[in-house]
């Protein structure tokens, strides 16, 4: 079995990355001539529409139904490292949107401002999910895990279980 993905590790660190990329591209659109008002409206529209679509989606509601039915798993089950999990959380959505926004920035800065808003919206939705996840886990004293993939099995284990090998102790 592949190492499990700790969904807390998957959802929290990507938030500032997405928000940061969104604002960097917004700045790029501004630098390439999109007016302050126009870029703000396009950015806000992209963020709002993405957040609205994701926060009201059926898939989101079904995730929490699946989470309640997650399979208990042993605390010793291997969990992917922070670095691998963060890298995996950027693929494909963040990387694809970053590439599309960079291409748009070169050819249509106004479109880049809209896409930058979508990137920021991804960060906002990620933050909402991360907060919901933390509250859900805390209420149940568990950690929610999955295997990589689109529609994956969800697992729970008691909070405080070892997630990866401890670093070697330093000699004093």
Predicted regions and their residues:
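Select subsegments of transmembrane alpha-helices in polytopic membrane proteins
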Residues: 11-22, 82-96
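Membrane-water interface of transmembrane alpha-helices
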Residues: 51-71, 134-138
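Alpha-helical membrane-embedded segments
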Residues: 49-50, 112-136
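Cytosolic juxtamembrane N-terminal segments of multi-pass membrane proteins
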Residues: 1-13, 66-79
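Alpha-helical transmembrane segments and their membrane-interface junctions
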Residues: 26-33, 37, 90-122
């Amino acid at each position: 079995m592949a190492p499990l993905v700790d969904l807390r590790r998957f959802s929290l660190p990507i938030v500032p990355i997405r928000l940061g990329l969104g604002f960097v591209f917004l700045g790029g659109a501004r630098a390439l001539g999109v007016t302050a008002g126009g870029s703000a409206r396009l950015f806000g529209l992209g963020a709002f529409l993405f957040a609205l679509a994701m926060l009201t989606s059926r898939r989101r509601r079904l995730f929490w139904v699946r989470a309640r039915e997650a399979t208990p798993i042993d605390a010793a089950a291997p969990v992917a490292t922070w670095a691998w999990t963060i890298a995996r959380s950027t693929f494909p959505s963040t990387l694809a949107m970053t590439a599309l926004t960079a291409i748009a920035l070169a050819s249509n800065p106004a479109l880049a401002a809209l896409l930058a808003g979508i990137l920021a919206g991804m960060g906002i939705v990620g933050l909402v999910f991360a907060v919901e996840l933390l509250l859900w886990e805390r209420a149940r004293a568990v950690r929610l895990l999955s295997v990589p993939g689109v529609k994956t099995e969800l697992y729970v284990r008691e909070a405080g279980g070892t997630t990866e090998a401890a670093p070697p102790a330093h000699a004093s």
